A protein has these predicted regions:
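Surface-exposed or secretory-pathway low-complexity segments enriched in glycine-proline
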Residues: 508-509, 519-552, 560, 591
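Flexible, small-residue-rich helix->loop connector segments that border functional cores
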Residues: 159-166, 179-192, 206, 216-222, ...
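C-terminal subdomain of the subtilisin-like protease fold in secreted/lumenal serine endopeptidases
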Residues: 281, 286-295, 301, 333-334, ...
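Hydrolase catalytic cores
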Residues: 229-232, 258-265, 281, 289, ...
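Substrate-binding/access-modulating region of protease and related hydrolase catalytic domains
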Residues: 146, 150-152, 161, 169, ...
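Protease zymogen maturation seam
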Residues: 35-50, 64-155, 163-169, 173, ...
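Active-site-adjacent substrate-recognition loops and nearby beta-strands
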Residues: 242, 268-269, 274-276, 301, ...
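Acidic-leg catalytic submotif of subtilisin-like serine proteases
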Residues: 70-73, 134-209, 226-231, 235, ...
Length: 606
């Protein structure tokens, strides 16, 4: 334990009530971090206390009496959040079904043998994943990895079950508290209020991180935290297992995972507000730039931001503290990313639905909403979470790392849920911050979030008719309800780079206006050329070099992918000025082509 037991506050009016209520313990909710106590007090977090009562005490009456004391500003019950998944995990076995011949023949960007099964990163439309799989229903990370695969200076706090920090595909990307690792066992060597927090901390038991605690019925840990961590940053290009979105290139350059354990077996404190709040503040005080949290309250539990902020104030205050903390030169605050919820309700669950946090919905390999995903108000963006009901096995769900102790001896397994969509978003955000560092860019939090939420592909054209999954889904109900679109890692990096993106469809010739690149008079300019490398044309299956027609780009892509193209025009007149002839000047624009399904006229917004 890191905190001593006290029962009185030292304020007479408060202590009278505490004595009357037989309070068994009273402690500061947030332990003293000597390095950050001034900031803690400035944020008012030092005023939060956690009270425990004897079992026979009427808690409603206790809250009523305490709230009547002038010195007490807020009373909050220690409610629980839950994991956003369906409770089922399927181990990856050595006899797992083979992928199709086409998928097996692909030259993959990294040598991790199971990357071919991670459709959620690179989806080639393999029918071995699902008969309805669509090429491009992924996060478009393959080309992004050529620009960056992560940066160790970016720390992602996984607030979840404990992460198995000894996992062979995670160990190299775990955040390490070097002061504690090289210090004295049983001593708070870095003064942050926690003892022996080597890779993070177990806020439920106030002790070491665990990932394999179950009771006699098998209830308890499930591997959920290790699975979400692997999606963010399983080690890439190490010749084993799977890849992580921001897991590096095999050169010790992945982002780092901090395990902030908020669920532990069947312990009474698992997922409570007190535990969550401490985990969020710890992440801020110890260097994290992103909170990855695939947890929440069932949709409808809260129905407005004000209601959530009032009734979950300790948690909300801790998240506000995290948001106000800059731990990375690329951004002036922290990013908070939650799953939207698995209740198939027409609203997101809180905390994710709160306006300052990113709430992630889920799609499956068919580029359609997953059967379980929440949608509607409070939902910001969509990412792959899988859908077990569209395939005869688990291939249509998300493959990631698992603790072998919980997974029939396998280090890898499949899960589905907005819990699985959420870490894809956290991984893409981590890639974006990594690339911003590489480019020497700095953004406000709002600027970065705006780029993140507009780096999307359109799913709207598919939302007609029905989908057969866990029952019949009427797809029109999801129109404009899943967020801004399906997250696209490459588009985010292009926004950071400053290279504009042109979204086109696949399979049909298109005339694409260039107004957004050449201005309102783009159709009236004289264009002198279009250039594109043979390699880039091959990436998109372009057989004939694109041309300009009627002031628009004439292009036909037959493959999903990304590539660069350059268009040259004359600014002023129809010829370029020379030493002897008056004329205009050459204007050259390079942009990235994103070929992903068919692009709607709304620019990619759902």
């Amino acid at each position: 334990k890191t905190r001593s037991v006290a029962t009185r506050a030292g304020i007479v009016s408060v202590d009278e009530i505490l004595s009357e209520l037989n309070v068994s313990s009273l402690n500061r909710l947030f332990p003293v971090d000597t390095r950050n106590e001034e900031r803690t007090r400035a944020a008012g977090l030092h005023r939060w206390y956690e009270l425990q009562f004897d079992t026979e005490v009427d808690l409603d009456l206790a809250a009523q009496k305490l709230s009547a004391v002038a010195e007490v500003a807020n009373i909050q019950f220690n409610t629980k959040l839950e994991k956003m998944w369906d409770g089922k995990a399927t181990p990856l076995r050595s006899d797992a079904p083979a992928m199709s011949a086409g998928t097996r023949s692909i030259v993959w960007p990294f040598n991790d043998p199971e990357l071919k099964r991670q459709w959620h990163y690179i989806n080639k439309g393999d029918k071995a994943v699902a008969q309805t799989a669509r090429e491009g229903a992924d996060i478009n990370v393959e080309e992004a990895w050529k620009l960056t695969a992560g940066d160790p200076k970016i720390i992602v706090a996984v607030v979840d079950e404990g992460v198995k920090y000894t996992h062979p595909d995670l160990a190299a990307n775990m955040w390490v508290n070097t002061r504690e690792m090289t210090g004295t066992t049983g001593v708070d060597d870095d003064g942050n209020g926690y003892v022996d927090d080597y890779y993070g901390y177990n806020f439920v038991t106030n002790g070491p991180i665990s990932w394999d605690v179950v009771d006699a019925k098998g209830d308890g840990d499930s591997g959920h935290g290790t699975h979400t961590a692997g999606t963010v940053a399983a080690v890439n290009n190490n010749g084993i297992g799977v890849c992580g979105v921001a897991g590096g290139s095999g050169n010790n350059d992945g982002v780092r995972i901090m395990s902030c354990q908020a669920l532990s077996g069947t312990a009474a404190g698992s997922g409570t507000t007190a535990v969550m709040a401490r985990a969020f503040k710890y992440a801020a005080d110890n260097g994290a730039s992103i909170i990855q949290c695939s947890m929440g309250i069932k949709g409808g539990g809260y129905t407005s931001d004000d209601q959530y902020a009032k009734n979950a104030k300790a948690e909300h205050d801790a998240l506000a503290y995290f948001i106000a903390t800059s731990n990375c030169d690329a951004i002036d605050g922290g990013l908070v990313i939650f799953s939207a919820g698995n209740d198939a309700l027409d609203r997101a669950g809180y905390p994710g639905a709160f306006r300052d946090y990113i709430s992630v919905t889920s799609f499956s390999p068919d580029f359609l909403p997953a059967s379980y995903t929440n949608y509607g108000p409070g939902c910001n963006i969509s990412a792959p979470g899988g859908d077990a009901y569209i395939a005869s096995n688990s291939t249509a769900t998300v493959l990631s790392t698992m603790p072998s102790e919980m997974n029939e001896g396998s280090d890898y397994g499949y899960m589905q849920g907005t819990s699985m969509a959420c870490p894809h978003m956290s991984g893409v955000a981590a890639l974006g911050l990594s690339y911003a560092l590489k480019q020497g860019k700095h953004y406000t939090r709002n600027e970065f979030i705006s780029m993140l939420l507009t780096s999307v592909n359109d799913m709207e054209r598919y939302l007609d008719g029905t989908k057969e999954s866990n029952g019949t889904m009427y797809l029109e109900n999801y129109r404009k309800q899943l967020g801004t679109g399906a997250v696209d890692a490459y588009q985010l990096l292009m926004q950071i780079e400053g290279t504009p993106c042109l979204k086109v469809g696949v399979g049909a010739e298109e005339l694409v206006p260039l107004t957004q690149f050449f201005g309102g008079s783009a159709t009236n300019l004289t264009y002198t050329g279009v250039s594109m490398s043979a390699a880039d044309m091959a990436k998109l299956g372009i057989e004939t070099l694109p041309t300009m027609a009627y002031g628009k780009l004439k292009i036909k892509c037959t493959k999903s992918g990304v590539a660069k193209i350059t268009v040259t025009a004359i600014g002023g007149g129809d010829k370029v000025g020379t030493g002897t002839v008056m004329g205009g000047m050459t204007i050259t624009k390079e942009f990235a082509i994103i070929a992903r399904g068919v692009q709607a006229g709304n620019g990619g917004w759902l």
